[in-house]
Amino acid sequence: MLAVVLTACEKGPVEWRDDTRQLALPVSGPESSEAEAHLVLRADGSPALEPVVTVATMPADSAACPGSLRIAALSPTEIYGAWWSRRENGRAVLFSARSDNAGATWATTVPVDTTDRGTLSCERPAPSIAADSTSGYVHVTYFLNSPTGPGVFFAHSMDRGDLFHSPVPIMYGDRPSASAVTAADSLVIVAFEDPNSQRPQISLAMSRTWGHIFARERPAASTGTTSAERPLVALRAPQLVVGWRNGSAVTARVGTLN
């Protein structure tokens, strides 16, 4: 009886608010996309979309996949980028680089993941990148067909992007899936399209160890929606917000971490 009572009282990893909010993208023009905006949680707990940092130059890579560069700012001057670079036979390499002068110039390109065995080339979702000012770590998530199978993966650097640790699988699955990552010191949250779902849905992966180990649970974030894709995520512990693209707007759901 005790075991039954304890099980019934267990809470999920996130307690979601009942409502969702529609947020307009802070960009204009026919080419506008969520790549030009990032999700934030204000001090009052309300979600908002803000323009991403802009850079004067891009990291030098003649094989870079168009539109795949994603940017994260650790400070006004310390900027990180991650992008796909095409290779032969439909494969791609995930690269990163750091700028110490707000994107005017870039340091040496560093490989994040070179293990792709797929044939998607540049026809895959762009990576996501987050730079945490508290820990100084850089976190990257992406979809790739690895030697152990296709799926969503996570990798991070503990030394200002000079070296990335071996990738960690978030979820294996065949469907190319977009993802988003955010961090606040030891707490890392990954929002991702479920690569096994027939209908696009957003799930979460959580780590309280700077991304070294992720909890086994993959709680759903877009429950109650017919379709959710291209996730966004932001964190102001203990609150987090997850967003997904909905036409010309972003649907956002706020929750509290248990």
Which ranges hold each PLM region?
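Extracellular, repeat-based ectodomains that mediate carbohydrate processing or recognition
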Residues: E10-N258
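C-terminal motif of bacterial Sec signal peptides marking the signal peptidase cleavage site
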Residues: V5-A8
